[in-house]
Amino acid sequence: MCCISKQIAETGSTSKVLIMTDVSRAQRAAFARGSFLLLLAVSCHAFAFNPAAPHAIFQGRHPVLRARSSRPAASLKLRMVSQEMVQGVVDASQAGLHLAFADQGSNLAGKFFQASLLPYLAFLYFLNNNGAKTPKLSGFGFGFLLLFVIATIPTGIISKTVYGVSLADVDWLHGSAEALLTVTNILIAVGFRDAMSSGTAEGERGTLKIVAIAIAALVAGAAAIGSPVLGFEAHTPFLAGLGDLPSNFFASMGAASEPANALSIPTWAIHFSSVFEWIFAMRLVWDYADASKDQTWKGLTWGMLPLHASGVAACTYHFFYNNPDLSFLVALQAGLTCLGNFTVAIAAARIALANGWKVPFFSSTEAASQQGDEKKQFLESKPPQESDTMLIAKLAGLTVTSAYLVKYGELFLSLPFQANAVAAIAMVATPPALLASFYLQKAAAAQEAA
């Protein structure tokens, strides 16, 4: 849901795609293979096994920056990417990347996208400082989001250059990229939940990390071979449309026919799971403030609210079948993402300051390290109210039910087939407003109890 770069794929003019007549299908296929596998290799090395990588950048210790002098093995791994893949990136990137970023630079969504990245890196930097007591798995999850950001750029380019449409209209690519966001939210939520149940923020869950990387590899592989090898079309459903009902299933009951770009059940399920997991993560962050005896963590819950609204904006756009007359929703989504990245960065900075963070180069490294070690104390253990199995069952049931209700329920309404801007804005504003009201009441109750 916190779609930092989803807008790069959901906006843009189809006419600009048609200008790219000099880019052959073979070049596009090579670009699809090369860009994804190269980006995946870099991303996994830089972030996947080191959630504090953005923090290391600010300290001049980033593993990629020092690979040539101190990590020759890491450099060798990157060189293992085949020459064909690299050449594919070189051949097609000038046309493809120019299209994506030139097109985005000319609209509001693109400007928001560009402005979103730096504050998110700042957020990761503050969140991963030694004294913040951020659960390690959650820190890994927030860093894993960058893999989703990277993935949406090539998938968006593939959507435009191969199919001539936006990523939102290419269901199999759309669902694949969105799956990385779902994985991100699961990592974040599980990290906070484990920390509170075990009483320590040091839990790693190495197996879960490996599964996350494996899913990222599957997404990369699918994007690389989906069109040139498997022959996937623009509207090929994600996961073969698992769970989709026949197109005329409700025709006798007066239901309208779905447009060709309607989301499949798996893609809708991925969207709803991301929304619900993010809401759950916000609640866990709020509770973590009490467990860690650090009330500044509650500010992060508030900082996450615009990112929740961004996810709702994306779902609203899909509810209206990505109607181009409602393209302002894409800009709104991008703006909310940009705002949310600033608010979580500010919240993380408050957490860091409350736990002894000092401006780099103006404080003793030894003192900062000693202070960080002192902060690695046990949290107040808080056993979960329900088992993992029950929680997963509830989330799965809510996700699948929501996917079916929206996908097939909207066929009985006229609203999704109209460009009703007022209704769209109301749909975007209502869930975040209700969530804000909920936390205002919790804050008021806590003040009264104190």
Where are these regions (language model features)?
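N-terminal chloroplast transit peptides
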Residues: M1-M80, A367-Q371, Q377
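N-terminal plastid-targeting presequences
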Residues: R66-A450
